[in-house]
Amino acid sequence: MPLADFHRSDPFTLGIELELQVVNPPGYDLSQDASTLIADVQHELTVGEAKHDITESMLEIATGVCRDISHAQIQLSAIQQAVQRAALRHHLQICGGGSHPFHAWQRQQISDNPRYVKTVEHFGYLAQQATVFGQHVHVGCQSGDDAIYLLHGLSRFVPHFIALNAASPWFDSTDSRFACSRLNRFSSYPDNGPMPWVADWQGFRRLFRQLSYTSMIDSMKDLHWDIRPSPQFGTVEVRVMDTPLTLAQAIHIAGFIQTLACWLLTERPFKHQPDDYLLYPFNRYQACRYGLDGTLTDVRSGEQRSIRQEILQLADRLAPFAHQLKATAALEAVVRQAKSPHSEAQQMRDFIANGGSLSGLVQKHCEIWAA
């Protein structure tokens, strides 16, 4: 399939996707009933969409194109409430979080979709192990060249995005010791991590043509990079975050990404180079392992500081752009989060340490999502 022309979008418009867990009380294991909910909820949706992901325990909700985070919040809230009503009708529950703490990947049913069937044929058991749950954020761009500049700029902040939403410490009934274990599920994929270096949209067209010509991919959907351009939507899509436990957190991280995008494309503070990515996997690992306490190393100076310190130092620089986008509340929430020692991952560990069960943890997450 040829690469679509880059669709010109209004700059800094937003789209948000959330992959949610469909669970089956009273045991709170993952259900295999996403298709039932999706079919039931369609007639209620007036904005956005609810759709399949790769397995039947995953339900994805997505906004349309949104002007700002308030617009996105209204859309997501309406979809959330419609899905909640459908779940109640079928005696199911919904929750966030990047991973289910005790599900068996072997029991996950692949959704009835030709693309997902092909994915299983290609990736085997890795596809079922990818029953993990993430948030994606699209930011509108006016041109392909803007999209490539923005992609490289946002790549500098991948550890920040991972750490802010890290909510997957438990996997296979075990404390992984990671704040975000979800991304480890993709480490065997050949396109895991950052996009190969290109300098501009013409370079990206050459890259896509080469990958297509060598039969590595059929379309953009076959590329699972941490951040990727989406020419058909005219966006850059950030794909590294766990689905958070609350809709509010999903909105806050989207507003933070939108604000960073506005700053990056307005001020052009960086001259991007291939060497920018030299320490990318190391800094990304720190965010997955330690969350906001992870240590970032500057690729040129060797200076080190924590992710939470970097966020706090960025805040003043970003404040005027957040105001311009009506995202000040989101930036302020991210700053409060960076100052707080109580991460979602640590709160999950504390729940278990205080005598809670893994099924009780999922039940709590369902209550949080429904609140």
UniProtKB/Swiss-Prot annotation:
User: Which ranges of the sequence are coiled-coil?
Assistant: none
State the superkingdom: Bacteria
Pfam families per UniProt: GCS2
Enzyme Commission numbers on file: 6.3.2.2
Query: What GO biological process terms are annotated to this protein in UniProt?
Result: modified amino acid biosynthetic process
Keywords from the UniProt entry? ATP-binding, Ligase, Nucleotide-binding
The answer to whether the entry has keyword Ligase is yes
Q: Which GO terms describe its molecular function?
A: ATP binding; glutamate-cysteine ligase activity
Protein's UniProt keywords contain Nucleotide-binding:
yes
**Reaction catalysis annotation:** L-cysteine + L-glutamate + ATP = gamma-L-glutamyl-L-cysteine + ADP + phosphate + H(+)
InterPro entries hit by this protein: GCL_type2/YbdK_subfam, GCS2, Gln_synth/guanido_kin_cat_dom, YbdK
According to its UniProt entry, the function of this protein is described as: ATP-dependent carboxylate-amine ligase which exhibits weak glutamate--cysteine ligase activity.
Q: How does it assemble?
A: Homodimer.
Which family does the UniProt entry place this protein in? Belongs to the glutamate--cysteine ligase type 2 family. YbdK subfamily.
What's the protein here called?
Answer: Putative glutamate--cysteine ligase 2
Please tell me the species this chain comes from: Klebsiella pneumoniae subsp. pneumoniae (strain ATCC 700721 / MGH 78578)
